[in-house]
Amino acid sequence: MPTINQLIRKERKKVVKRKKTPALQACPQRRGVCTRVYTTTPKKPNSALRKVARVRLTNGLEVTAYIPGEGHNLQEHSVVMIRGGRVKDLPGVRYHIVRGTLDTSGVQDRRQGRSKYGAKRPK
C-alpha cells in the first residue's frame, strides 16, 4: 500500500477497459463483404472443422467471423451482417455472422432456437 507522499508524487493509474468488439465501433451490427470463406480447427481439447469467413466491413476493417448453424450458402463476395460474440475455442474469432439477413440464408429444418438462426416457423 502506498504512502501519502508516494501518492502525491505519482497518482494512481486509471485502468483502461478494452472493448471486446472494437471493429463494430459501438454499433450493434455491421455490414461487410466476405473476402474468404473457409474452415478451421479449434483449440486443444476440441476437434472439428469450424466454418468461418474473413469479412471486410463497411468501415474498412477486416475481421474473422464465425458462421453458426448447420450448412451455409456463403462464398466470396457475399454481403453479410456481423454481430459481436466470440467463439471460445477459435482464437481470434470475436464476431458472429447473423443468419437470415442479406445474402446469408437461414438454417434449414431448424425447429428450436429458430430466431437465432433465421429459420421460419415450420408448417
From Swiss-Prot:
Region (Disordered) location: 103-123
Positions bearing 3-methylthioaspartic acid: 89
Top-level taxon of the source organism: Bacteria
Biased composition (Basic residues): 113-123
SUPFAM superfamilies: Nucleic acid-binding proteins (SSF50249)
GO BP of this protein: translation
Gene Ontology CC terms: small ribosomal subunit
One GO MF term attached to the UniProt entry: tRNA binding
Keyword line: Methylation, Ribonucleoprotein, Ribosomal protein, RNA-binding, rRNA-binding, tRNA-binding
Subunit structure: Part of the 30S ribosomal subunit. Contacts proteins S8 and S17. May interact with IF1 in the 30S initiation complex.
Function recorded in the entry: With S4 and S5 plays an important role in translational accuracy.
UniProt cross-references to HAMAP family, sorted A to Z: Ribosomal_uS12_B (MF_00403_B)
NCBIfam families: rpsL_bact
Family: Belongs to the universal ribosomal protein uS12 family.
Protein known as: Small ribosomal subunit protein uS12
Species: Nitratidesulfovibrio vulgaris (strain ATCC 29579 / DSM 644 / CCUG 34227 / NCIMB 8303 / VKM B-1760 / Hildenborough)
